[in-house]
UniProtKB/Swiss-Prot annotation:
PROSITE patterns: ASP_GLU_RACEMASE_1. It is an enzyme of class 5 (isomerase). It comes from the Bacteria. This is Glutamate racemase. Transmembrane segments: none annotated. Provides the (R)-glutamate required for cell wall biosynthesis.
């Protein structure tokens, strides 16, 4: 399947399942959207890689996606990939590339206390891009920054298919430091967390607003690349890496859950 050629209007890239809610949200707005989702399991998680590693790997994946699928627009549905590689990848291809970056501007606009929590990967938290967002939009704000690699791994391994009590327990552990700090806005700055956004909001309660970048990214993607009638209906999910039966079964289930065709493995 690695040399399979198909054409899709929209391409979504992530290291794992994080970008699936973004792809799904676009298809909710445009049910017949032609879309390919590529999970780069070879390099999961991006959040503990160096900037140079992420740039090199994202470049290779994007080149493969361009060659095999000829998308009209690419969405980097991963904060770690976006803060590290967005500008580099935009210079690499002729089609628009939309990034997913921490929704700090939105968080500042929502915050009354100017005390904001950011939950992300380690490399997103420490990257200068995130520091620039804080400086540009968050003057006078106090930021509580926290990485949670454990929750990301749990979500990647299928937490969303477990009973809700188990999901809620994992999310409650993750938000406890933010509750203790008294933040009034929490930014979900890793796309994996968006899978359980409703539980984040339930756990922090009405005194805190949970924000993410999903709606803004989908709006921007459709504004830059309106759907075309000649490319309709085909929506597929690919995964990079060794042809592992457990991974295949897990991603086939994810694909079905989000209304995509499980298309198999992509060699990158």
């Amino acid at each position: 399947m690695s040399d399979r050629r198909e054409q899709f209007q929209y391409a979504f890239l992530d290291s794992g399942i994080g970008g699936l809610p973004y792809a799904h949200a676009l298809r909710v707005r445009v049910p017949e959207a032609s879309l390919v989702y590529v999970a780069d399991r070879v390099y999961f998680p991006y959040g503990n890689k160096s900037s140079a590693q992420i740039i090199a790997r994202a470049s290779a994946v994007l080149q493969k996606v361009q060659t095999n699928f000829s998308p009209h627009i690419v969405v980097l549905a991963c904060n770690s990939m976006s803060v590290n590689a967005l500008e580099f990848l935009r210079a690499q291809v002729s089609v628009p590339v939309v990034g997913v970056v921490p929704a700090i501007k939105q968080a500042v606009a929502c915050s009354h206390k100017k005390h904001i929590g950011v939950l992300a990967t380690q490399c997103t938290i420490t990257h200068p891009y995130t520091a620039c967002l804080r400086a540009q939009f968050g003057a006078g704000c106090v930021f509580q920054m926290r990485a949670d690699a454990r929750l990301i791994e749990c979500l990647e391994r299928g937490l969303i298919f477990e009973v809700e009590d188990m999901q809620r327990e994992a999310v409650a552990r993750s938000v406890m430091p933010f509750q203790e700090a008294g933040v009034d806005v929490l930014v979900l700055a890793c796309t994996h967390f968006v899978h359980v956004r409703h539980l984040f909001q339930d756990c922090v309660g009405t005194s805190c607003t949970v924000v993410d970048s999903l709606e803004g990214v989908v709006r921007r993607t459709l504004r830059l690349c309106p759907p075309q009638s000649q490319l309709r209906g085909n929506a597929a999910c690919y995964v990079t890496g060794a042809r592992d039966a457990v991974c295949a079964a897990r991603y086939a289930r994810y694909a079905q859950h989000f209304g995509l065709r499980w298309a198999g493995f992509l060699d990158v």
